[in-house]
Amino acid sequence: MDFKQHIAIVPDYPKEGIVFKDITPLMNDGKAYKAATDAIVEYAKERDIDLVVGPEARGFIIGCPVSYALEVGFAPVRKLGKLPREVITVDYGKEYGKDVLTIHKDAIKPGQRVLITDDLLATGGTIEATIKLVEELGGVVAGIAFLVELTYLDGRKMLDGYDVLVLEKY
């Protein structure tokens, strides 16, 4: 399926100079959303995944249906102050600013094979931070899946040594 026809291009959002790739049209089309989810599920099945991890918020949109289809758990990575129990944290930079990500300390058991999911790979800051959280808890990053990669931002360089699936590139 050509997923690009289901991704809206929004110039100057959230800041001037940013060209945002909006996946909500893909989510609004049940067949496209299912096809994207199925592609990631097939990728994950080849990697013997124990747990799916996704950063807030669009990583949830991708990761939850994948974890459901695989019959494995989902662990959210959230911004500081959004998780109610003891967390570990990491500071990170992203395409349009800086932030802190967290995950519950008990979210991942040592040795669990983890699939990280997110909507978009831009500079790689969010995923690099998510990888650090997973690995600090003893998880093994068995795969990383994105709907979209912005190749001109060169975020892939942050993922050397990791197995990556991208459904569409810009």
UniProtKB/Swiss-Prot annotation:
GO terms for cellular component: cytoplasm. GO terms for biological process: adenine salvage; AMP salvage; purine ribonucleoside salvage. Gene3D superfamilies: 3.40.50.2020. It is found in: Cytoplasm. GO terms for molecular function: adenine binding; adenine phosphoribosyltransferase activity; AMP binding. InterPro entries: Ade_phspho_trans, PRibTrfase_dom, PRTase-like, UPRTase/APRTase. Keywords: Cytoplasm, Glycosyltransferase, Purine salvage, Transferase. Coiled coil: none annotated. Its EC number is 2.4.2.7. Pathway: Purine metabolism; AMP biosynthesis via salvage pathway; AMP from adenine: step 1/1. It catalyses: AMP + diphosphate = 5-phospho-alpha-D-ribose 1-diphosphate + adenine. Belongs to the purine/pyrimidine phosphoribosyltransferase family. Catalyzes a salvage reaction resulting in the formation of AMP, that is energically less costly than de novo synthesis. PANTHER family: ADENINE PHOSPHORIBOSYLTRANSFERASE. Homodimer. This is Adenine phosphoribosyltransferase. It comes from Bacillus anthracis.
